[in-house]
C-alpha cells in the first residue's frame, strides 16, 4: 500500500501501477453518453495522454480508449491510489507549508469511500460532483501541494492543476475554477462533450472546492428547514407523530433521515439504489429499512399512532410511494403525510439523477446508456406522475416544497402541472424552501458556516463545539432581535445534540448556521484556542456555497429575489474575488451546483486558522465581507430583513457604507408614468 510520501511524489510512472480496473463492491457512476464524433474521440484520448511521457503512451492509449468507450469518460482507473483514502492528521502530510497540508487533508476527505458517492470516478456527491476529472490530476495536485511555498499559488482549471505560480504571502495559496464555460455553450449537451474531452468538469459545490464534510453538511440545514416548515405550514413546534416523506439517501440527501430523527418526526425516505440505502443504515443514519410498500405504510401508521421518532428507508421508487399514499387517501379518507419534499439529483435527471418509476434500478442504468432518448421520455413521464400524486395529496392538509434540486423546474419542462398563475419565472405551484424558509434566514446573514479540525482528533472537535456554544450564549445574553435569537436558540440546540447523533462521517468537522457576528466570534475563539494549544492543530474554516453570498441561483438561493436580478451572477463572482483579496487561503468559483449546469454560479473558500494574529485578522476581514456582500445585495433587491441587518452592521462598522434602496411608496406613480 502507498504511503502519503509516495502519494505526494508525482505521477507513478516507473514502474506504472498495476491496472486493476474498476473495483468491485463499491458504487460506480452511471455510464455517460457524450456522443463524440471519431475526431472528438481522438481529441479526448490525446488530451488524456498529454499527462504522460511518450514512452508509456502506447501502453496507456488502448485502456484509456476502452474507458471512453465503456464509461463515456477517461477516469484513468490504473492510477487510482492503493492507499486508504481518508483525511489523515495534518502532521502526516509532507509539505513546505501547513496550509498546503490542510488542503490535502480536505481533498482526501472528499474522496474517502465512507464520504464519496462514487469514489473511483472521483465523485463526492450529487451524482456528478467531481473533485477531479481523472486520477492523473489528483496525483499532480498532491505533488504540487507538497512542494508549494508561502510565495506560490496553485491554479486549478476544472480539475486540471495548471501549475504553481509566484505570488505574495497574502495571496490565496489555491485558486479553483470549475466549469467556467462561455455562457452560450453552457448547455447539458455541450457539458457531456466537454467533460468527455477532459476540458471542463462539474464540481457541484463543495466537491470541486475541497470543502465537503459528509452528509452532516446538509443535516443542519435540513433540520432548520423541517423545523421552520412545521412552524409555517402546521403552526407547531413539536413534530411528534408528524410524517415527512421525501426521496434520496445519497451524499447530500442522506441527511434527511438523520434530520427527521433530530426534529422528532417520522421520516420516510425512498431510495432506488440499495447500496446507498444500506450505507446510510450501516452508518446509523437510517433506523429501519424495507422494500415492501405494504410494510412501509404499516410501519408509518404504527409510528404515527404511537408518535414514535423514526427514520424509515423504503427501497423503491418514490413515485410508487407517492401514488400509494394517494391510494390510501382515496380508499380510507386518511392523509398519512403532513410534509413532503424531494431530493433526487434532478439537476442531472437523464444521467442517473432521477430514476423513472416504470423501470427497475438496473433496467434504468442500462437504458440510459443504450437509448438516452427513450430514457428521457420515461423520466419525464415519471415526473408527471409524481407531481400528479403530490397535487392530489396537497388538496388535503399536506404541504410540499421544492428542495432546490431542480425538481419543479424539470417537472415543468416535462409538462407536469406545476404552474402558478400570474407568477414570475422563478415561482411554481409549490414554493422552494428558499422562498418560504431559508431566504429570510439568508437575509439575516445566517448560513452554513463550518470548520474542520485537521488534527483528526474528536477531542479538538469537542472543544470547538464548546467554544461555539459559549459564543452564541454570550450573544443572546448581550441582547439580540427576537428573530435572531430564535436562530441562535435553534443553533445552540443543534450544537448540543450534534455529538449525541454521531454526525461525523469522514473528517472531524462541524456545521453551524451562523450570522456575521457569530462566524467572526467563533473564528476568533477557535484561533485563540489553537494559540494556547487547547486545540492541537490548525482548523479550516469554510461554508457551503449554498449561503448568504456564495450562490446566484434563480431556482434556489436567489429565488426569493424579486427585482429581476435573480438571473444575474454579480454577487457570487464578487464574493469569490472579495474573499481572495481579504485573506482566504483558497477560493473556488463554479458553474452549476444544486440546480444544475448552466443554472447556477457559485463559489466558496477555505481559510486556515493557525493561532497567529495574522490568521485572526484575515478571519475578521474576510468573514465580514463574505456575509455582508449577500446581505447588501438582498437589501438592494427590497428585502426588509436584509435592510435592517445591513443598517445595523453599518452602525457597528463605520468603514462599511452600503447603498440603500428607496421604496416606491405610491404604485400609482408607475402606472401614471407608463400610462397603464
Curated annotation (Swiss-Prot):
List the GO molecular function terms.
urocanate hydratase activity
The source's superkingdom equals Eukaryota
- Annotated metabolic or biological route of this protein: Amino-acid degradation; L-histidine degradation into L-glutamate; N-formimidoyl-L-glutamate from L-histidine: step 2/3
Q: Which InterPro entries has this protein been placed in? A: Urocanase, Urocanase-like, Urocanase_C, Urocanase_central_sf, Urocanase_CS, Urocanase_N, Urocanase_Rossmann-like, Urocanase_sf
Q: What Pfam families does the annotation carry?
A: Urocanase (PF01175), Urocanase_C (PF17392), Urocanase_N (PF17391)
What residues does NAD(+) bind to?
A: 126-127, 204, 251-253, 271, 317-318, 343-347, 354-355, 403, 594
Necessary cofactors: NAD(+)
Where is it found, in Gene Ontology cellular component terms?
cytosol
The catalysed reaction is:
4-imidazolone-5-propanoate = trans-urocanate + H2O
Its EC number(s): 4.2.1.49
The Gene Ontology biological process terms listed for this entry are: L-histidine catabolic process; L-histidine catabolic process to glutamate and formamide; L-histidine catabolic process to glutamate and formate
**Region annotation Disordered: where it falls in the sequence:** 15-35
What UniProt keywords are attached to this protein's entry? Disease variant, Histidine metabolism, Lyase, NAD
Please tell me the disease that this Swiss-Prot or TrEMBL record associates with the protein: Urocanase deficiency: An inborn error of histidine metabolism resulting in urocanic aciduria and neurological manifestations including intellectual disability, ataxia, episodic aggressive behavior or exaggerated affection-seeking.
* UniProt record similarity statement: Belongs to the urocanase family.
Name of the protein in question: Urocanate hydratase
Q: Which organism is it from?
A: Homo sapiens
